[in-house]
Amino acid sequence: MIYTVPETSTVVFDIRENYPTDEIVIKEIWEEDVYEVKETRLNRGGVVIDIGANIGAFSLYASYYGATVYAIEPEPNNLEALKNNIKLNDKENQIYVCPYAISNYKGTAIISDQGGDSTIVDGDILGSEVEVMPLDNFFALYHIKEVDVLKIDVEGAEPEIILGASKENLQKCKYITMEFDHRTGNRLGEMTQKLSETHHVRTMGSWERGGMVWAWLY
């Protein structure tokens, strides 16, 4: 089903059958602005890294306001939908698709599709093998020098990304925005403590219920 974003009349998404989260994610970003970015943080020509790009809702939002986007999505079903939505909106030259999982180590992992959400799982659970790398390796691979917005939504694996990144590379990120859930666990405090070394940090929610983290560079 083709869904047109009401605010634009031009941005469209191919909503998948049996994936109820697709439309929810689009509305969270385009209507509710849960990541608190709006156009003020999305400068034309700026750089956005979208970790956990899913079907491309945030990536297309950032590209709509002129940013260059690195859309990171390892799960094959989401990856296919991401590429399709980028093509539907003629953004192939503005959004770069990166089929990796970002964590605190380099190697491989099994990732499972859970109705639109995806998460790294134990090897005895069915899923797809994907390449894994730390944020530092990703920055080196794509020669990232400065990031206007780093968005993270990886179903509880946010701490591994932040704790596995160097202070030097976190300082390259002007604004970091992420969603977390109960799977983040009590590592939330450790993660925000590290972020506070380089950024002002604001949180909403708790590790038991989930919530949001927003951080902007000192």
Where are these regions (language model features)?
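Phosphate/nucleotide-binding beta-alpha loop and adjacent structural elements of enzyme active sites
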Residues: 1-218
